[in-house]
Amino acid sequence: MSFKFEAEVRSAQGKGASRRLRHNGQVPAIIYGGNAEPVSIILDHDKVNNVQIHDAFYNEVLTIVLAEKEVQVKVQAIQRHPTKPKLLHLDFKRV
């Protein structure tokens, strides 16, 4: 099973910017590792939330399309809301 997500580069940083993203149905994330600089990105919350129920999401290499360039990543960490079924932040590591 392969997973592919469309992402945007995130320009606004901080708690307020992250809250605005979550309120608009998006989730902040970061891609780090490899020989490149870390990149803050924005993903669609519902798309990620619907596929994260599969075990393969955590074990397989995922593809993130960022500025028409594909980046191969694995899930490193996920932060979830303590009482709601919401994702707060995702960390991806380049493969």
UniProtKB/Swiss-Prot annotation:
It comes from the Bacteria. CDD domains: Ribosomal_L25_TL5_CTC. Gene3D superfamilies: Ribosomal Protein L25, Chain P. One of its GO terms (biological process) is translation. Keywords: Ribonucleoprotein, Ribosomal protein, RNA-binding, rRNA-binding. One of its GO terms (molecular function) is structural constituent of ribosome. GO terms for cellular component: cytosolic large ribosomal subunit. Part of the 50S ribosomal subunit; part of the 5S rRNA/L5/L18/L25 subcomplex. Contacts the 5S rRNA. Binds to the 5S rRNA independently of L5 and L18. PANTHER family: RIBOSOMAL PROTEIN L25/GLN-TRNA SYNTHETASE, ANTI-CODON-BINDING DOMAIN-CONTAINING PROTEIN, RIBOSOMAL PROTEIN L25_GLN-TRNA SYNTHETASE, ANTI-CODON-BINDING DOMAIN-CONTAINING PROTEIN. Belongs to the bacterial ribosomal protein bL25 family. This is one of the proteins that binds to the 5S RNA in the ribosome where it forms part of the central protuberance. This is Large ribosomal subunit protein bL25. It comes from Haemophilus ducreyi (strain 35000HP / ATCC 700724). The lineage of its organism: Bacteria, Pseudomonadati, Pseudomonadota, Gammaproteobacteria, Pasteurellales. The gene is rplY.
